[in-house]
A protein has these predicted regions:
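Short acidic/histidine-rich motifs immediately flanking catalytic phosphotransfer sites
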Residues: 10, 27, 101-105
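N-terminal pre-Walker A segment at the start of P-loop NTPase domains
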Residues: 27-37
Length: 259
């Protein structure tokens, strides 16, 4: 496998099975105790070279769609790096981080977990300064036992937040609503509930598109989505809230969401 990787263009490899490289080996062979940990440590170092907004996206369902909507809302104003597909694991996240380049102005990283301690490890790699939690469901309930445990694990996404870090929570999710005032960071809620910071009103659909009025402290604006489903309204609200927080006007975010 290693010779094949080098032949395909790899300049160096981590290995935990070799004390030294074969005499005829090409490329750099780096002996480590744990290749997965070495990959994550290298990604964490690489991430530290970039002083840009990094948005982590997690939740039991809706992570990928929300990530795509956040990217759409921002891409008209920013050079965006986003997770491709669902590369959101302890292997996929580092590989996404390595795609960061100097041209990128913002990164949107999907972050998934299936066991206790995993989100904290991902947070140390990505070090998001903003994060979205879409909801708390039953995914991985076998490993984590209760939804409260799932919530606690998901919220480790803020472990490496800077003092100005911002968390965007689905205000329609009762488990997230219950903790929104006790978290050690700035919290913005979104949803259809009357007390959400970013709220959808007058939601309607014609079978091909979904339209609603976005109401937030900065004002109101009409939003049109080329998709159906009330869940997508929530995803779009999250995207608009993040966009405004990183300096993208709502009008610009609306254009991105429409397309």
């Amino acid at each position: 496998f290693i010779p094949a990787a080098i032949k395909s263009g790899a300049a160096a490899v981590f290995t935990q099975e070799h004390v030294e490289a074969p005499a005829d080996a090409a490329g750099a062979w780096i002996a480590v105790r744990d290749t997965a940990q070495a990959l994550q440590d290298l990604a964490a170092w690489y991430r530290s070279r970039f002083s840009i907004p990094v948005i982590g996206v997690t939740g039991s369902v809706g992570k990928t769609t929300t990530k795509e909507m956040v990217a759409a809302a921002l891409s008209g104003a920013k050079q965006v790096l986003k997770t491709e597909g669902n590369f959101n694991s302890q292997i996929g996240l580092p590989l996404t981080v390595f795609r960061l380049e100097s041209r990128h102005e913002i990164a949107i990283l999907e972050m998934g977990m299936s066991e206790i301690g995993e989100m904290g490890r991902l947070a140390r790699i990505a070090r998001p300064n903003r994060a979205v939690v879409t909801n708390i469901g039953l995914s991985h309930i076998e490993q984590l036992k209760t939804q409260e445990n799932i919530r606690a694990e998901k919220l480790h996404i803020i472990d490496c937040f800077p003092p100005e870090g911002a968390l965007f929570l689905n205000g329609d999710d009762p488990l997230l609503r219950a903790v929104r005032k006790s978290l050690p960071c700035r919290v913005t809620t979104y949803g259809t509930s009357a007390d959400c910071d970013f709220r959808a009103a007058d939601v309607e659909s014609d079978g091909e598109t979904t339209r609603f009025r976005l109401c937030c402290p900065e004002g109101e604006i009409g939003i049109e989505l080329p998709v159906l489903g009330i869940h997508n309204v929530g995803n779009a609200l999250a995207a608009a809230a993040v966009a405004l927080d990183v300096g993208v006007p709502l009008e610009k975010a609306r254009e991105g969401l429409k397309n």
